[in-house]
Amino acid sequence: MRKGFTLLELLTVVMIISILAIIAIPQFFRVAERARASEAVNVLGIIRSAQLRYYAEHSATYATSLADLDVDVPPNNDDYKYFNAPNVGIAGQASMTRKNAGASIGNYTLTINYDTGDINCTGGAAGTCRRLGF
């Protein structure tokens, strides 16, 4: 009696593993990029809360600089791994742009509206914002 696997059995296992990898790898990259985007989403949420406090205390105007806000958000690009430093100088909005993304993702921008809290995504490679759920 022979012990071991036949060539057909080994090829079947290799095919099944290949099919699973083909399905799983794109999902992995999407989930990984979504996790990277959470860096910006968290910072933008903190800025929005600070801007709403500033708005209530300063005659219905928003701050135009991070230094004017009562938050501990780093102001320099080097302080962030995946995004550039936030821009709060936009009327009623703050934004952060992805840096050093590959060609398949592109450098997209996430923008939060202070009034509604909605986060919008623009730019990047075709379909990036849709794949990330924005």
Q: What is each stretch, according to the model?
A:
Residues 11-15, 48, 73:
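Generic low-complexity, intrinsically disordered sequence content enriched
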Residues 1-32:
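N-terminal single-pass transmembrane signal-anchor helix
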Residues 52-134:
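Periplasmic/extracellular, small/polar-rich flexible segments of pilin-like filament-forming proteins
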Residues 22, 30-69:
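Conserved hydrophobic/amphipathic alpha-helical signal-anchor segments
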Residues 4-8, 41, 63-66, 107:
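Generic N-terminal initiation segments characterized by hydrophobic and/or small/turn-forming residues
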